[in-house]
Amino acid sequence: MNKENELQNYLSISPDKFGIYLFDTKNLTNLYKEEIILNNDTNYQNHDELKKFLDDNIFKIEKLSGKFIENIFLILEDKKIFNLEIGIKKKNYNISVTKEYLENSLVEAKDLFRESYHNQEIIHMIVNKYFINGKMLLLFEENLKCENFALEVNFKSISNDIIYDLNKILENYQIKISKYLDGSYVKKNFKNDIELSEMS
């Protein structure tokens, strides 16, 4: 891993707080952390407030890291994050279920979602359960003999309009969003910064 990839930048946006972080993935330490609590009168989608927060912190992070921020992971907590569970049931014509068969099934699920929700960008695709011949499994086991295969998948997505607005703001700093993360999902499933950096 080169030095440039050892540093990850995160921007967190929620109804009550903005946060920006610089994380060293090699030494597993947070090098910079700045958060601002938004008062009840502040609309967290107020772009002027977000721009001011970025103005106050981007240069400090760049000075600390010795390089420009080009990419950032965006952690978004918003009621507008769309959640959808879908199930896919398939007849398996092979002797057993392979990893490749699973991957193809997940691609099919993703395609189904995109066909139905054109204005949404998938940020998380979570497999909740697998069913092999009607038996539920929480973890995928390869090469099990199987005639009937089913998946229960949870999609988390945000609208392309929100993506467009956030990209426009960050373009002013020549920063691209590398990945979007659902803040509620992150809080629920990742105990610390190390686990989060491994996910991203």
Show which residues each predicted segment covers.
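Nucleotide/phosphate-binding catalytic cleft detector across ATP-hydrolyzing
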Residues: M1-K17, Y21, T25-N71, L76-S200
